[in-house]
Amino acid sequence: MNPQKIAVLGPGSWGTGLSQVLNDNGHEVRIWGNNLEQMAEINEKHTNTRYFKDVVLDEKIKAYSRLDLALENVDAILFVVPTKVTRLVAKQVAQVLKHKVHILHASKGLEQGTHDRISTILEEEIPAQLRGEIVVVSGPSHAEETIVRDITLISAASNDHDEAKYAQSIFSNDYFRLYTNTDVIGVETAGALKNIIAVGAGALHGLGFGDNAKAAIITRGLAEITRLGVAMGAEPLTYSGLSGVGDLIVTGTSIHSRNWRAGDALGRGEKIADIEKNMGMVIEGVSTTKAAYELAQRLEIDMPITETIYKVLYENLDAKSGILDIMRRETRAENEFININK
């Protein structure tokens, strides 16, 4: 493939990490953000110290604060902005974009209120004549490891196989490998909902529970993620792949995960408002918990872990009391309520 011009919308840790992958593959990368000091730092010092203290970026990676300039003559746009601003940024893109491009996203969340997936938002806000089918790039990936070129394998899902292959071709190299997938709903919901379980896994650690408990919440968390995803139209086998169990393992067991760290702090008795303030970064699992809880209520899907975490985050339930509530639920068969045939 010829070198591509790619706008990466979102200068956070994952946007920066993916920008480096694309740059390593010979593409022209333009990072867009609205923090003027951060954009100047990337251009002048080739660093993004808010997220990476000791990483120097290639000087060919350029940062833009003007969206129209960042999108000028690009071949592809990669959205890596927080879920809560995705619709706003998509509207802005639609206003200034002058030609058809590939649209990809690497965000993980559900929109508050609408409960929409990211691809749904992008489809609604960016006219079809300006884009192909949306590609979801998701899987087990810590930006802290990708930025130092550690081996990472993730999925690229689209309703159009050619679009998924495009994502595969621009990203894949010796340390970063993409597998194509056609289950957009499954890949997106797996990536979003695992953040909820990661908060719970972190809380168990903060409460002092051991590996048995952590394995249990990850496994049972996967079961309820699958239940909700299948009810939304996903393929159940997707949840046993990279974007499902893979992402759940990496996010639910690692100190690199901000969702896990937030849960750990909750388990130690801190309040979520203080945790978010101290971290200074978006904790997607917090807002996703609310959206998933409301969606599960609407679809009548049993999600006891999600419900408990919702009560801890939004109703001031004590985390340890929440664990006991789950343990005291009526006993049942392990595979109850998992309908793999949809």
UniProtKB/Swiss-Prot annotation:
It comes from the Bacteria. It is found in: Cytoplasm. One of its GO terms (biological process) is glycerol-3-phosphate biosynthetic process. Keywords: Cytoplasm, Lipid biosynthesis, Lipid metabolism, NAD, NADP, Nucleotide-binding, Oxidoreductase, Phospholipid biosynthesis, Phospholipid metabolism. NADPH binds at S13, W14, K108, A143, R258, V282, E284. GO terms for cellular component: cytosol. The active site is at K194. The keyword Coiled coil does not apply. Its EC number is 1.1.1.94. Pathway: Membrane lipid metabolism; glycerophospholipid metabolism. It catalyses: sn-glycerol 3-phosphate + NAD(+) = dihydroxyacetone phosphate + NADH + H(+); sn-glycerol 3-phosphate + NADP(+) = dihydroxyacetone phosphate + NADPH + H(+). Sn-glycerol 3-phosphate binds at K108, G139, S141, K194, D247, S257, R258, N259. One of its GO terms (molecular function) is glycerol-3-phosphate dehydrogenase [NAD(P)+] activity. Belongs to the NAD-dependent glycerol-3-phosphate dehydrogenase family. Catalyzes the reduction of the glycolytic intermediate dihydroxyacetone phosphate (DHAP) to sn-glycerol 3-phosphate (G3P), the key precursor for phospholipid synthesis. This is Glycerol-3-phosphate dehydrogenase [NAD(P)+]. The lineage of its organism: Bacteria, Bacillati, Bacillota, Bacilli, Lactobacillales. The gene is gpsA.
